[in-house]
Amino acid sequence: MRLLYKRITVRIARPTHSNFLSRESYMRRWHFVVAGFVLAFGAGLTAQNKAESRDMALLAHNDLQARSAYMPTIHRQGDRYIAYVGHHGGQMMNPLTGRMEPNGTSILDVTNPRSPRYLFHIPGDAGQGEGGGAQMAAVCSGATLPKADRTKVYLLRSFGGSAHEIWDVTTPEKPSRVTVVVSGLRDTHKSFWECDTGIGYLVSGDPAWRAERMTKIYDLSNPASPVFIRDYGVFGQQPGSTGPVPTDLHGPISLGPKGNRVYFAHGTGRAGIVQIVDREKLLNGPKEPTEANLRYPVIAQIDLPPESGAHTALPLLGMPMPEFAKQRPPANHPQPGMGHEHGDTIPRLTTGAHRDFLAVVGETTGNECLENRQFVRMVDITWDTNPIGVESWNVPEASGNFCERGGRFGAHASHENTTPIYYGRLLFVTFFNAGLRVVDVRDPYDLKEVAYYIPATTDKTDQRCVGQANAPDRRCKVAIQSNNVEVDDRGYIYIADRANTGLHIVELTGAARRIANFPGQSTAQR
C-alpha cells in the first residue's frame, strides 16, 4: 500500500529561527449472546496464537522473564555476540536470583542465535510504564572510545525517567555500574552514543526546560568521567521561552564527525518534527540556549502534519538510482553540497545517479486504531537544506484485520544498524500487532513489502485494553506488540515485544533474503 506523502513543510534555518422473558427463553437468549460473544471476540483473543510469516523464519525465542521489552542492542564482544534489551517499567520474578526485580536491562548471549542464553538482569527504576525500567541501551567497546580502558565494554542506559548511567559489561554475566552521567531528570528515552568519539546525545527531561524531552550532550569518551557539553532542543522548548511548546524529542541518530550530521526525530505520533543539524556547529558553536544559538546548527527542519509523528529518522545515503544514470546536468548546474564523507559501511555520493534519503517512521500510540495511522515516510535529503517527501508506505489493515486484533496497530520503529548486509536494500520496521515488516527500499520512490513475521502469543503475552478501568464498555485483548527491532552484523534480526512476549530472533528466507548482501552471495543470487 502506498500513500504518496505530499504535505511536508520545510523551514530553512538561519544562523540568526428486552420485555420480560420466560426462564427458558432467557437462557436460550443468554446462550446465544455468549456464543455470539465467542464468535465476535474469540478470534480477536486468539488470532495470534500461531506465528504468521512470509519469507522469514523463527530461529529462537526467549521470554525475557516476561518483562515488557523496548530496545534490543546487539554487540560483538570478542568471539561472542551479546544482546542488551532495555525494558519498560514494571517488575517480574528473576529466576536467576529468586527475587522480584524492577524491569531493567536483560543481557543474553546470542552467539548461537538458535540457542540464546539469558545471562543477567540489571534491575531498573521501580516506576511503571514509561516512568520506570531502563528502556534505552547503547554499547561501546573501550577499544574504540578515545579515552576509555581498551579492555572494557561499556553500556549506556537510561534509569527510568530520572537518570542516565554507564555500566561495565566486559563480563556480561557480572556487570557493574561505573557512573551516573546525569540524574534529577523528569524523563528519558532513546539516546545515541558515538563509539568512535564518545559523544553521547542523551534524551532527557531537564526540569528547567519546557519540553519533557530534549537533548543533553556529553563527552563520554572516558566513561568514568563524563564531561557536559551543552543542552539542545527545538527553539520554544528552552527555559524562558513563550508560546506553544514544540513536541518532545524521541531520539537522534548521528553520522559522527565524518558525516557531520545529526538527525533529531520529534513527536512520535503527532506534530512530528525532524531536524537536520550540522554536528560540528552543534558541538562547537555557542551553547547558551538562546533563540539564535538553538537555530544556529540547524540546516533544515521538516514539520510533519499534525496527525503524523517522527519516532525514528534513519539516513540512507548514497542510494544508487539507475533511473537517473543517463541524466547529465549542465556543467554550471548546482550540485548537492552536503559534504558527507561516509564511513566504510555507507556508500559515497559519487554521481548524479546517487541520492540521499531519510526514512522517517512515526509511532502508533493508541489501541485498536483509536488514533491516526502512522507511516513509514521517505524524504529525499540529497539537498539537505531542501528536503522533500517522495513516498509513504503502510501495512494495509484489511490484510490481517489488525484493528480487531487488540493492542496497537501501526508503525513504530526501524532498525538502526548500518550493516552493509541490509543498508540501502531492506528496512525492518515494527508494526505492533502486525509484527515485523520488511520493506525493499532500493527504489525509495516505490517502497515494497517483501517479508514479514508476526510472532505467536504465549502464556506470558499481556492483554491490551480500550476504555477506562471499571467502565462497562472496557474491553481487553491479548495481542502481540512487536515494539522495536535491530539487526546484528551477521544479518540476524531481533524483535522485542512490548506485551511481555519476549525476544524473537528471526532470519530472512526465500526471495527476500536474495535482496540482502550476505557475504559470499553472488550478484546473480541478489
Describe these PLM feature segments.
Residues 1-4, 30-33, 109:
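Short intrinsically disordered, low-complexity coil segments enriched in acidic
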Residues 8-10, 21-34:
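Bacterial N-terminal signal peptides that target proteins for export
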